[in-house]
Amino acid sequence: MSFGVLCFLGLALLSAPSAAEKNGAYYQSLQKRLIADGFDAAAIRELYARPEVKFETKGISVYFVHRESKVHYERYTDQLHIEKARVYLQQHRAAFADAENVYGVDPEVITAIILVETQLGTMLGSRSVLNTLSTMASLSDPKVRNLLWRKIKNTPDLTRAVFDKKATQKSKWAYRELMAFLRHARSQGFDPAEIKGSFAGAMGIAQFMPSNIDTLGKDGNKDGKINLFDDADAIASIAFYLKEHGWQPGIERNKAAKVIYHYNHSNEYVDAILSVTERLKG
């Protein structure tokens, strides 16, 4: 068990008091909610007292101005990306074959998703999932919202009305995701403060949100754990996700588009996935 995990389970760090004081104004009410919802009080206090657990002002401001239309998905259909995707297909052919046999999902569409989500597992995100979800979840507290607004109010294209609406909506969602993340960390035995992910808290090669892992994550390499940073687990998990949302062998393109839309609610994203899939099959 790593030193970080031991800290999460309750060992105090020498730097904890200063970190706790720094995060106190932001995470005090959040910690109370987590404890009230059944998390161990000592473990939660120790976790949020660690110096690497911070309120992510910069990261959260990116979230508030993100627009899908600004993501250039078309680049993934160029020859360089397609060739890399074909290499990935070959490298993990056994895992793809297993996923296709069990779930009936084409290896090419799984590869397309991994290509677009994480560039075939090479870009997994650099933001702390714990910090991201904790920051968003804490925005249910009006005092915390005001503190954050004062720091990011000069962000381009962001008004107070838009900020308040989005903060209120997403704080509830983020709290559910945070609880799922902490439970997953506990069940799988990893340190929640060490996991990196996207600006919204998605994690692993498959870029699953934490709430999807326990219900849709699969142990592709049969090692007894669900680790979405492992290629075989990610491949099996994506296959199961698509199957659960309606994917079938030989599915028509319009129906495939509806299934993929569940993975990311963006028409541009869906078009890119289908285009890459078709090129890989061609």
Describe each model-derived feature in a short phrase:
Residues 1-4, 8-201, 205-207, 211-282:
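Cell-wall glycan-active module
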